[in-house]
Amino acid sequence: MLPTYVRLFTAVCALATTASAVVPIEVKGKDFVNSKTGDRFQILGVDYQPGGSSGFTKDKDPLSDPDACLRDAALMQRLGVNTIRIYNLSPSLNHDECASIFNAAGIYMILDVNSPLYGGYLDRTDPESTYNDVYFKQVFGVIEAFKNFPNTLAFFAGNEVINEQSVKNVPTYVRAIQRDMKDYIAKNLDRSIPVGYSAADIRPILMDTLNYFMCADDANSQSDFFGLNSYSWCGNSSYTKSGYDVLTKDFADASIPVFFSEYGCNEVQPRYFSEVQALYGQEMTQSFSGGLVYEYTQEENDYGLVQINDNGTVTLLVDYDNLMAQYSKLDMSRIQASNTTQTSAKPPKCESSLITNSTFTDSFDLPKRPSKVQTMIDKGLSDANTGKLVEVKNTDIKQKIYNANGEEITGIKLSILASGESNTPGAHSSGSTSGSSSSGGSSSSSSDKESAAGTISVPFVGLLSAASFMAFFML
């Protein structure tokens, strides 16, 4: 019979497959922070919508195919990202395996609650007609589906709803949706999950949009964060030529986290992603909390980092390699350092004087909540398909992976991270091409290894590293 300490150590290792790889992220002032360590969290991410909006149906979404999720999570882990954004989700589908896979990979999820299907979005030309209980079954359904995953970072209440085609009162409806989502979360969730808005880069109204959603009111309808879809840096531009210096100045006084919810101009190809060094540099990190590159998969609009082939195999494009190279240059210790000045930022009070453009509403009178929506909030969604964290049993991907030259890359697999650890560039770079040397596993710096030793959640002994746990029972 095996000694007790060996059996217990084996049990701890088994638990590692279901242990929470990440800890929830919170908003403090203008920063995202790790809820356990207090370290600042900077988004290094990609937008993830394989097939685009046309590939989404009520029976299939980006987080409903575990084999595809395992493949993509391993490739994203290798790339160095710590966050993905998903635009369209079907609440009725089972997302447990996919969400758990990304959790194990140390990758957070920012989720849009809308869908392009009938009843799943706010009509920007007639918002009153779609602000109803049918719409909120979609919204609250997404919240229910992902509320139990520690890697659910945030929810987007809207994406570019305010544009040239929208009517003037649309912002009041978006704030009302945020109010309703935050009330549902407060009433029906065990933790607070941030809610925010993703804006188009329309410069004449950009600061009005920020101020409108950032300011505080009695209804608790303000955004917890602000996303910006911006493509002003093209090719080997610069901090000043791209206008990034202007954006940095404009958002310097923001009281909530601001990040690029989309970036990566494709006018010059392949993309160099030289803006990564500016975005995570000394100047911009005072105003921005990182960003999400548009986008992971190659679609008709030609923004992809990878090409998913018809047989499920994947070809890594030059853009993938270029982005990975840019990520590898980042000083993560500086990027993640906490700043008490930023975490203590307070929002302004909502007043009409915050709005300067006459085309943008200065009214903060929100539409009344429909009675059926109030019932959903009070009692919870009656037919909720509530998700749960599950064991990640397999880390080997089934599909073949090819580099930009068409050579097969072997040995790519998912690394299940230690409890409390999120993915960082260069820490999990599995895979090698024929004739090249590679361990096929993960490589870490000394500081990464210290972090990876981490802790494993063991219900009856608290938080102990696996090595410490074994050593304890060897005494």
Curated annotation (Swiss-Prot):
A lipid is attached at S451 (GPI-like-anchor amidated serine). Residues 420-451 are annotated as: Disordered. One of its GO terms (biological process) is fungal-type cell wall (1->3)-beta-D-glucan biosynthetic process. GO terms for molecular function: 1,3-beta-glucanosyltransferase activity; glucanosyltransferase activity. Glycans are attached at N236, N311, N339, N357. It holds the Pfam family Glyco_hydro_72. Disulfide bonds join C69-C98, C215-C350, C234-C265. It is a lipid-anchor; GPI-anchor. Residues 429-446 have a biased composition (Low complexity). It is an enzyme of class 2 (transferase). (1,3-beta-D-glucosyl)n 1 binds at Y87, N159, Y294. Belongs to the glycosyl hydrolase 72 family. This is 1,3-beta-glucanosyltransferase gel2. The gene is gel2.
